[in-house]
Amino acid sequence: DSTQALTTAWKEACASASPSTILVPKGNFAVGLITLEGPCKSSIGLQLQGTLKAPADPSKIKGLGWINLNKIDLLTIFGGGVFDGQGKSAWVQNDCHKNGPICKTLSMNLRLYAVTNSILRDVTTLDSKNFHVNVIGCKNLTFERFKISAAETSINTDGIHIGRSDGVNIINTEIKTGDDCISLGDGSKNINITNITCGPGHGISVGSLGRYKNEESVVGIYVKNCTITGSQNGVRIKTWPKSEPGEASEMHFQDITMNSVGTPILIDQGYCPYNQCTAEVPSSVKLSKISFKNIKGTSTTKEAVKLVCSKSFPCNGVELADIDLTYSGKGGPATSVCENIKPTIKGKQIPAICSGSAAKAA
């Protein structure tokens, strides 16, 4: 077990007044729960060439994260190595749909808290028991040439989940998993997601928002040059009905290719998984300044564009331009569904957006 060796190396490197790098060489290293804590005296690197392996038994890790990175400035993680969560046997325990209240919260592969001015590049997170990467309270953080991999059947294995963080960049990254490729929780600000391949999975999502009290607003989400393949959804914004009040604005999705995607464009203000909520009461999360531009490809559902906004707070300032989404299944061609929204439409629109009977009163 290399837990102690890595922890000791970190403490020594963190105490160094000059920049230092910890090398994990090629090979497999069993590692239990680890917390790598700052602040450090200088910049610090973790060069991961080998594979760190989590215990397969989920009960061996107490807490939300397997590898926890806390309060670190100027961190670089690189080297081509792998964080292997060994989650396959644990996923059945993560099925809240089946297990209900006894659904266990399992450990995430990487949990970053208050990490600033840092970069993770050329590493892989594999088979996490829960979310692969959780980013909370971070600032100026970049994921580049980052790779995330888990089976399509894995449960709750969001690729990168971000909350209450400012200035996170995810670029040139490949994500294949069983839940959202990227999910953006409350307090996500100035997030740039560029040149991502996503799928399988549930697409790139803002939310879900409005479930908890005192959520922070979401502002400045930019998703560009992405390819989404074989996922349940494409790009989506989801808020809970009967929600706490909240706001999300300046969310822009552009130049995205959809290959056999469930619902390529989705605003869902009645998001209610497992019917655990009161859907009759509209969402109190205000959505505004949203654009979907140059989004093309194929939908596996007839409703290729679904814009279902809140009756209490209709979506405001939504623009769709150059949409070309086709459906070749039964009852085709593709259609759009619109509720409580009057978007601005420009350029090509396949399917016709919010036309005729599809448009409900805003």
Curated annotation (Swiss-Prot):
Q: Which of the seven top EC classes does this enzyme belong to? A: hydrolase
- Main role? May function in depolymerizing pectin during pollen development, germination, and tube growth. Acts as an exo-polygalacturonase.
Q: What is its main location?
A: secreted
| UniProt-annotated glycosylation sites, renumbered to this chain | 140, 192, 195, 225
Annotated keywords: Cell wall, Cell wall biogenesis/degradation, Glycoprotein, Glycosidase, Hydrolase, Repeat, Secreted
GO CC terms of this entry: extracellular region
* EC identifiers of the protein: 3.2.1.67
Reactions that this protein is recorded to catalyse: [(1->4)-alpha-D-galacturonosyl](n) + H2O = alpha-D-galacturonate + [(1->4)-alpha-D-galacturonosyl](n-1)
> What PANTHER family does the database record attribute to this sequence?
PTHR31375
**Is Secreted there in the keyword field?**
yes
Which residues of this protein are catalytic?
179, 202
Name its cellular compartments.
Secreted; Secreted, Cell wall
Q: Which domain of life is it from?
A: Eukaryota
Q: What is this protein called?
A: Exopolygalacturonase
Return the PbH1 repeat spans: 138-164, 165-186, 188-208, 218-239
Single biological process term from Gene Ontology = carbohydrate metabolic process
